[in-house]
């Protein structure tokens, strides 16, 4: 574990001596930086892989990018301010990585699961000039977290891979199916897949997004 970045992180450095492409991993609610980092051993060695720990601790363990609150009737809402604070810290990490690990500022990808997926999508739509590829697993577009849309030209270089479990019991698949529609309305290139699983990443899902990323880094 290393902590040169604003958030606790684990890092796998690239085999390249300079200008390495970057993949930033954002875990889901209640997890930590080591969860998605398990993918690192199977991903291209030229990638500098940075797995970040969300800033808000949960009891008895785990971390969150923002609180999810419930009222007496079990209605649910997100803490938008915490989400925006987390996105600002993630952006600081992305900017710091360039000098720390000699990475390529024009080749930064995000991979997020669940809550991490929701923020990955929002970060790319709010800061399209910063990112190249987005892998969004088991999440959706939360419009509360988005800035006003930019001109379509701002998004023309972005590529999105999104996937969801057709039996997801945490985030309804119907929410995820709205993601490609929104991306297409902005002229953004995207791929969407569903797999016969719940709230998780099937092996077939992993191999599909791995190849998708290899073709684009």
Regions found by a protein language model. Give the residues of each.
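A conserved short beta-strand
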Residues: 129-141
């Amino acid at each position: 574990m290393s902590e040169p970045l604003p958030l606790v992180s684990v890092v796998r450095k690239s085999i390249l001596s300079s200008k390495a492409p970057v993949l930033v991993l954002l875990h889901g609610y209640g997890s930590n930086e080591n969860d998605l980092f398990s993918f690192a051993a199977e991903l291209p060695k030229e990638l500098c892989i940075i797995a970040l720990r969300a800033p808000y601790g949960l009891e008895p363990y785990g971390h969150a990018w923002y609180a999810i609150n419930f009222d007496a009737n079990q209605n649910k809402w997100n803490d938008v301010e915490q989400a925006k604070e987390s996105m600002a810290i993630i952006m600081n990490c992305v900017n710091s990585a360039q000098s720390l690990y000699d990475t390529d500022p024009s080749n930064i990808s995000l991979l997020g699961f669940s809550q991490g997926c929701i923020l990955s999508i929002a970060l790319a739509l709010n800061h399209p000039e910063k990112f190249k590829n987005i892998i969004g697993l088991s999440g959706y577009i939360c419009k509360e977290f988005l800035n006003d849309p930019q001109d379509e030209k701002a998004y023309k270089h972005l590529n999105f891979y999104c996937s969801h479990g057709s039996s997801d019991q945490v985030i309804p698949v119907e929410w995820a199916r709205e993601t490609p529609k929104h991306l297409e309305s902005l002229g953004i290139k995207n791929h969407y897949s569903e797999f016969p699983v719940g709230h998780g990443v099937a092996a077939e899902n992993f191999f599909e997004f791995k190849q998708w990323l290899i073709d684009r880094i």
